């Protein structure tokens, strides 16, 4: 699935940035006619529904011409929300010390889901140290399928 999101990122990142927003990341969930293409945007001010609508209209026009995904799908443009998704190494670095929930592409020691605090990020090894109830574990960022901040209330 990385190829689809990479292609879309290349296509839309300059457009979104030209509109004054940051492209945080893309999720593509393939499920036949119920597939979802979710685009996360941010800015230094809060994202409104109107912001999402404006970006969605612009991207819809581009996708109608370029057709980066074959078949039907629903386009969703969203703010990161309170449980912000993390897509890149830089995102993990920005949120050192924060609680996260991770879902891996494949199990590691029989476990696919992890919860803990981001302890450190290694530039050299492309890994994060996740500190949880059972201690620290080093995880390869490329093996993380989905990551979100977890907010404690």
Curated annotation (Swiss-Prot):
> Has UniProt tagged this entry with the keyword Ribosomal protein?
no
Biological process (GO) annotations held by this record are: ribosomal small subunit assembly; translation
Q: Which Pfam families match?
A: DUF150_C, RimP_N
What are the record's GO terms for cellular component?
cytosol
The record's subcellular location field reads: Cytoplasm
Q: Which UniProt keywords apply?
A: Cytoplasm, Ribosome biogenesis
The superkingdom listed in its UniProt entry is Bacteria
Q: Which HAMAP family match?
A: RimP
The family annotation for this protein states:
Belongs to the RimP family.
Q: What is this protein called?
A: Ribosome maturation factor RimP
């Amino acid at each position: 699935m990385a190829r689809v999101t990479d292609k879309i990122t290349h296509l839309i990142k300059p457009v979104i940035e030209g509109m004054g927003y940051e492209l945080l990341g893309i999720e593509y969930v393939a499920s036949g006619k119920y597939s979802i293409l979710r685009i996360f945007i941010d800015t230094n001010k809060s994202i409104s529904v109107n912001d999402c609508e404006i970006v969605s209209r612009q991207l819809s026009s581009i996708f109608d011409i370029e057709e980066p995904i074959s078949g039907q799908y629903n386009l969703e443009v969203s703010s990161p929300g309170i449980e912000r998704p993390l897509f890149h190494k830089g995102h993990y670095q920005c949120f050192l010390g924060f609680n996260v929930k991770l879902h891996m592409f494949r199990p590691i020691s029989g476990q696919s889901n992890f919860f803990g605090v981001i302890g450190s990020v290694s530039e050299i090894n492309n890994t994060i140290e996740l500190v949880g109830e059972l201690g620290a574990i080093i995880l390869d960022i490329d093996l993380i399928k989905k990551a979100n901040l977890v907010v404690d209330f």
